[in-house]
Amino acid sequence: MQLIGTISGEVSPTNFNVLLSGASVGKGSYVKINHDDYGWVLAKISDIRRSLSNAGEEVISAKAFTIGYKQDGVVRMPKTPFKPMDRVYMADGELITNVIGLRRTKVGNIYLGSLDGCGIPVYVDLNKTIRKHVSVLAMTGAGKSYTVCVILEELLKNDIPIVIIDPHREYPSLKVENDDYDNMMAYAVKPASYASKITEYTTNPLTNPDAKKLCLKLRFNVDELSEIMPIHLADKQKMILYNALHRLEGQEYTIYDLINAVRLEKGKDKWKVISLLESIASTGLFDGKPITEKDLVKAGHASIIDLKGSEPWIQQLVVTKIAKDLFAAMKLNQLPAFFFLIEEAHNFCPERGFGEAMSSEILRTIASEGRKFGLHLCVVSQRPARVDKNVLSQCNTQIILKVTNPNDLRAIGQSIEGFTSGMESDIKQLSVGQALLVGECVEQPITVNIRARETKHISAIEAKGKSSDEPKKPSLDRLRPFLVKEKEFEVVGEKPPQKDKEKEKQPAEPKPKEENKGREDGRLQNKKKSLRGKIVGLFLKDEEEMKK
C-alpha cells in the first residue's frame, strides 16, 4: 500500500483535508482510509493546494470527499468521521471497482473504456445503463459520435435491436474494421465489422444507392396527417381532409388516391390541401412497399435511417412517422425492447423558444412513457440548451463529453440530480475522448477515457472506398428503380381556379413569329436529346468499365 499522507484539520463523514507527504497524487485520484467502525472506505481527491508554512517550508494539502464502503451489495456512507492523523493510502483497483460498481459480470456488460487516473476497465451494467434512457452530450469535436459508436458496438454484441436516426450519415462506418492497432491494443480491443448486422434505409437513393429506399406506411387520421403537413391547416381544410379520408375508409389507397379524393370536395379551400399533399407526394416517401416495424427492429441488428440531403421538414416527417409507428407497436407488445437513437436531437425535440418540430410531441411521449414498454431512447446533441428540457431530464444515464458553453452547461445541470459546481468544472476541463459518466449505472460520477473503437472512425464516403471529393456513381440498373417519374392519375372534380389575365401586372411577352418559334422548339428538343444521351451514356460507360 502506498501511503500518501494523513488527515488534518476539521473532519466530517463526507469531507476532510489531507496533508500530503510528497507522494505523486493529482486531482481526481482515488484514496482509501481504514475507518475504525467500517473498515476500508473509498474517497476521492477534489482539489490540491500548495502553500508555505510559518517556517517557510512548502506544504502540499488536498481536499477529499467520501464515496463510501460496500456492505451487503450496497454502497453506504460512514456515519461518523475519520480521526485526525488517520493515514491515507492510494486506493487499489479491487476497492475502486467494487465500490463504484465497475465489476464485469458474465452477461449484460457495456465496456466503455478506462477509469481516468488509474486505468481500471470501466464495465457498466447494460440494464442500468440503456434501459432507462441515455443522453450523450458534447460540444463539436469532443468525440460525441465516436463515443456513440462505442456504445452501439457493445449493444450489437449483446444482440440489442437498434434504430438510428442519422441526419448526416455518420454511422455506416460501423461496417468497416478499425486498423488503428496501437490504440486498440491499449484497450485490449479487437477489430470488428458489423456489416452483416446493419441495414441502411435512405430518403435519398441518388446519394446513397447502396441503401434501401425508405418507404413509409400511408395510414393516418386527420390529426396525424395535419401534423406532417409543411404548414398548419385551417379548420375548413381539416374538414376537407377528413371527408377525403372517409371516402377511402376500408380500402387500400395511395397518396395519389387521397389527392383525387380531395379533388371531389367542394370549395376553394381544397386547393391548398391538394398543394400540400402534392408536396408530400413529391418526397417519394409513400411510393413503393412500406417498411414495417418488424423490418426495423430485429435482435442484434441496427437499422440506420439515413436522412442526409433531405430538407428539415422531410426529416421531421420521417422521424415523426417512424417514432409514432414504433411506439404504437411497442404498446401492443409486438416488438422486442430496443434502443432508439436520435442524433441531432435539438432538431427533432427542440426546447421551447428554439422553434417547434412536428416530431417534438411523440419524442416527449416516448421520453416519459417509452421505458415501461421497452422503448429505450438515446438523445445525442452538441447543443444541450436547445434540447427539450423534459426529454433531457428523463435520461437516467448521462454521458457528457467536453462542454464549455454556459447555456449548455446550465441545461446539463438542470437535467442531472445533485449536479455540483465541481462537476461543471470537470466537464469544462475534459480532454477530447473523455466523458463524465453519471447515472444509476455508477455509484459516483466518474471520468472515463472512452475506449478505442472496434470499427473505423471514418466518413460514409470513405467507408465505401472513395475519397471525400470523389463520390460513388450509382450504376444505371441500381438507379432505374429510383428515377423520379411523373405520377399519372385521373384528374377528377373541378379544375383549380385560373388567374384573371386582366389583373396581371406584368405585360405579356410578345409572341415570336411562327417560323422563329418552330426553329426554337426544334433547337430545344435537340438540346434535350443531346443532354439525355450524355446522362445515359455516363451510366452505361460506368457499367462497362465495372464489367471490365
Residues of each region from the PLM?
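P-loop NTPase motor domains
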Residues: 154, 169, 173, 179, ...
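Glycine-rich phosphate-binding loop of nucleotide-binding enzymes
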Residues: 107-199, 437, 469
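Alpha-helical scaffold elements adjacent to nucleotide-binding pockets in ATP/GTP-utilizing enzyme cores
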Residues: 150-151, 170, 224-225, 240-243, ...
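Hydrophobic residues in beta-strands of the RecA-like P-loop NTPase core, especially within AAA+ ATPase
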Residues: 165, 342, 380-381
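Basic- and hydrophobic-enriched, low-structure N-terminal and domain-boundary segments
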Residues: 1-137, 146-153, 158, 333-336, ...
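Conserved ATP-driven motor cores of ASCE-family P-loop NTPases powering translocation/secretion/packaging/pilus
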Residues: 365-369, 373-451
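Conserved P-loop NTPase motor module
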Residues: 433-548
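Conserved nucleotide-binding/hydrolysis micro-motifs of P-loop NTPases
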Residues: 50, 68-71, 131, 168-172, ...
